[in-house]
Amino acid sequence: MRFTQKFSIRWVSVCLLMAAVRISAQEINISHCLNSCPDVSRPTNEVSLHHVFAAAVIPETGEVEWVAYRILPESIGIASLLPRWWEADRLLRGGQRDAALEQTPGFVQPDISNAQDREYRTGEIRMAAEDRGRLTPMTSFAATPYWPELNQLSNMSGLPQSMRTGPWSGLDQAINELTAVVAPLYVVAGPVMSHQSKGRSSESDRADAFYKVVSDGQRVAAFLFDANLPPHAHFCAQVSTLAEIEGQVSLALFPDAELDDDAELVAALGCS
């Protein structure tokens, strides 16, 4: 109840074209983001704001450009028994049509033995069932009443299973554990698309890599995951820099914050 009372007042689900807008010379700040949310690659992209995360979506393709979220100690919980399903984000003006996805919550993944059921369509993006995952992890918000929002397509990306269940998941766990001593933590995550495939909707287009950047408000730790990483790879071997990742995605991820890549923050995540 304490969590609900604390956060229901501060967070509101709306859909904006920009993460921060100025109305009568006043700036609206989004609590998911540090000072302000990341840039978007085009003015037509939509930013969908929910109780536990914000997401930038390319309306023509349904691609998620980035997600941003803030983790607090009281938001973290056990997510192993929470049902997983996919549903369209109703806050997006363009919708996420033609999403032939499982609509009923359940604890068991659907049978994908039939080849016709092995692909799911999100707008014009198609991805194999095993290569879809949540950019914002359920574990970070399992203790809140808003965890079902993480089943929306605006939180889905083509995360390869081997990478997602290995080093990517390991970093999520390390971030959650760090909130016990450092909170809040601000996280931005998303895909790194090749320059040839950006803005296109070809079935063969896949992200070359995925990034996750975490900040305590002053320091930043950046990680870049090659899409072909095996499950036994460790997230500590994927340490990058904020400048490197921003250069690859051509976006400012923390546009109104002065942050330094910090070895101590990386070490606090378990990387010596």
Where are these regions (language model features)?
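Short, His- and charge-rich active-site/binding loops that engage polyanionic ligands
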Residues: 51-129
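N-terminal signal peptide c-region/cleavage motif recognized by signal peptidases
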Residues: 20-21
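Domain-level detector of nuclease and nuclease-like folds
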Residues: 105-272
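N-terminal module-boundary/linker segments of secreted carbohydrate-active enzymes
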Residues: 24-65, 70-73, 260-271
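Short beta-strand-initiation
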Residues: 8, 50-52, 208-210
